[in-house]
């Protein structure tokens, strides 16, 4: 997808997280399955990643958005290492999922997402993200200046950054 939102760069910060929201909503509509989101944008089902999302901002402020949903893979399609962390809709639901229906639903959800982004009205998307974020209320590992640390994930801020509390009780926001 090559959306051209024509917005200032700072307004485009949440696009990757919003794409995760769109995937969750599309899967719910088509399959009835509620996905979780692992911050910042990994749709999760059955504790495993079900989708990959990549976003690139070009110099002209166009957004290149790539979304790959694991729809029909079976266990033989994943290497043992990948099978530990990834799954497919078919594997988790035990039935086939229409790729055409899912693609149509995803395009509709992305269209709604861009309308909300252009209007500056992300409150509903942020509330949904907070509801399905699997990191909130848990301890997370963060790589900061080459050093791993642990912190408690406590919230998602208005730009979809992860708000954490470190071992000393200090709050900070992590950006992807």
What is the meaning of each model-derived region?
Residues 10, 15, 80-82, 157, ...:
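Short, solvent-exposed amphipathic alpha-helical segments in soluble enzyme
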Residues 38-39, 48, 73, 77, ...:
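Residue-level signal for pocket-adjacent positions within structured domains
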Residues 53, 67-69, 152-154:
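A short, well-structured catalytic beta-strand-centered motif of the EAL phosphodiesterase domain
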Residues 60-90:
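Short, acidic (Asp/Glu-rich) active-site segment that either coordinates a divalent metal cofactor
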């Amino acid at each position: 997808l090559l959306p051209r939102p024509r917005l200032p760069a700072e307004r485009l910060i949440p696009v990757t997280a919003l794409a995760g929201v769109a995937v969750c909503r599309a899967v719910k509509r088509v399959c009835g399955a509620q996905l979780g989101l692992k911050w910042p944008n990994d749709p999760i089902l059955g504790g495993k990643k079900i989708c990959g999302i990549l976003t690139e901002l070009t110099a002209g402020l166009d957004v290149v958005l790539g979304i790959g949903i694991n729809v029909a893979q079976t266990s033989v399609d994943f290497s043992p290492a990948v099978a530990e962390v990834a799954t497919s809709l078919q594997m988790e639901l035990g039935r086939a999922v229409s790729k055409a229906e899912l693609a149509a639903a995803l395009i509709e959800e992305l269209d709604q997402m861009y309308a909300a982004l252009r209007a500056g009205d992300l409150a509903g998307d942020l509330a949904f993200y907070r509801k399905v974020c699997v990191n909130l209320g848990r301890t997370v590992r963060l790589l900061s200046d080459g050093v791993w640390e642990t912190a408690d994930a406590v919230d998602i801020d208005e730009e979809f950054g992860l708000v954490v509390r470190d071992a000393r009780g200090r709050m900070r926001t992590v950006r992807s």
